[in-house]
Design a protein with these regions (language model features):
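Helical element adjacent to the flavin cofactor pocket in flavoenzyme catalytic cores
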Residues: 87-144, 153
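Mobile amphipathic helical/loop "lid" adjacent to a hydrophobic cofactor/ligand pocket
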Residues: 1-86
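Surface-exposed helix-capping loop/turn segments at secondary-structure junctions
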Residues: 39, 57, 122-127, 139, ...
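Generic structural signal for well-ordered, non-membrane alpha-helical segments
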Residues: 39, 43, 60-61, 105, ...
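Short, surface-exposed acidic
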Residues: 54-64, 176-179, 259-267
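Amphipathic alpha-helical segments that form well-ordered structural scaffolds
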Residues: 49, 111, 115-119, 249-253
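Mid-domain catalytic core of redox enzymes
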Residues: 131-244, 248, 252-257, 286
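Conserved flavin/dinucleotide-binding core of flavoenzymes
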Residues: 214-332
Length: 332
């Protein structure tokens, strides 16, 4: 209940199983990172900055690496320090609520997508789900043709590897090249169902040296108490495993905490191979003026100038594209 930033200071100083000297070192590194964030220094990889600071290996393994993997879904060697600063500055460093960790008890479709669709329908929007869209074309009057229908403008809010195939055929090479050069990282989620309840230490339990980085106690979210979900960010960097291998490794992680468990009764493994774009130093979206002149407005989490590919980035990018479209039509 302490005001910011005392809540962070107190939380770190009260952390268990960490020496006082490491706590002070972490606070010192955080202060140095805040100083970097306020300046206009060149961007660099997080790993490079950590080496420059001679950060102890334990802090790298138990704090910085989980933080960067979870926030940027990019390995330390390639992760942008500037983007990490933006996430911290607008989040945990900004105010006390910014450090509150929220776990939804419903799926994100029910929380975000379905209410958004319902709101659009209130305004008379024509929602067409499961409809394949072909390459966009412009009519002489400037309108955009989508599947033989003409529209005043189009916001392309698809994954980047789909968007590049939707842009007009004469789209400049620099835009197409930017899209083709994007790098991606995977996220793997492993679901395990046991014969008995699995009571983890917290709704979200972190593992610094396991295969899984986070174990989610589904019972705390109103779901069956005998189910555990494990999240592995940058899973392409962790290893190339088959589904059964992922399940076995995560089961071993769970048994470290709850050794009484037998083999799971059921498992499910989902790997999104292109879950997010890599968040690398000095990366920035291309100039979309050519597309804007043709009433085509790209949007997506991968286009945010300050954030990694996150829900926040997706929402803000969509708002920016919509505002630019309305502005070009003189509506705002």
């Amino acid at each position: 209940n302490l005001p910011s930033p005392l809540h962070i200071l107190t939380g770190i100083l009260r952390a268990k199983n960490v020496s006082f000297s490491l706590k002070i070192r972490l606070l010192s590194d955080m202060a140095a990172l805040q100083h970097y964030a306020r300046g206009k220094r060149a961007d660099l990889a997080v790993a490079q900055w950590l080496r420059q600071r001679n950060v102890p290996r334990r802090l790298v393994a138990e704090f910085w690496q989980p933080l960067v993997w979870g926030a940027l879904n990019t390995p330390l060697e390639h992760a942008s320090l500037r983007i990490l600063c933006n996430v911290l500055s607008d989040g945990v460093w900004a105010d006390k609520p910014g450090s509150d960790y929220l776990l939804p008890k419903r799926d994100l479709g029910a929380i975000i997508a379905e209410p958004a669709l319902a709101k659009l329908k209130q305004f008379g929007a024509d929602i067409r789900l499961e409809t394949r869209v072909g390459r966009l074309k412009n009519l002489p009057d400037g309108r955009v043709v989508v599947n033989d229908e003409a529209f005043d403008a189009v916001i392309v809010a698809t994954a980047p590897y789909h968007a590049v195939h939707l842009f007009p055929e004469d789209t400049p090479d620099y835009i197409q090249t930017t899209y083709q050069n994007l790098q991606y990282h995977s996220i793997t989620t492993v679901y395990l169902r046991y014969a008995v309840p699995v009571h983890l230490p917290a709704p979200l339990t972190g593992l610094a040296d396991g295969t899984a980085q986070w174990l989610v106690y589904r019972g705390a979210l109103g779901l069956p108490t005998n189910e555990v979900a494990a999240v592995i960010s940058v899973s392409d960097y962790v290893g190339a495993f088959k589904s059964q291998e992922w399940a076995e490794k995560v089961h071993a992680d769970v048994k470290r905490i709850r050794p009484y468990l037998d083999e799971p009764e059921a498992v499910r493994v989902i790997t999104e191979k292109r879950a997010t774009t890599a968040c690398m130093p000095d990366s920035s979206p291309p100039d979309f003026a050519w597309l804007h002149q043709r009433r085509i407005y790209p949007a997506g989490d991968y286009l945010h100038p300050r954030y990694p590919a996150t829900l926040e980035a997706a929402v803000q990018s969509g708002l920016t594209a919509a505002e630019r479209c309305l502005s070009d039509f003189g509506l705002i």
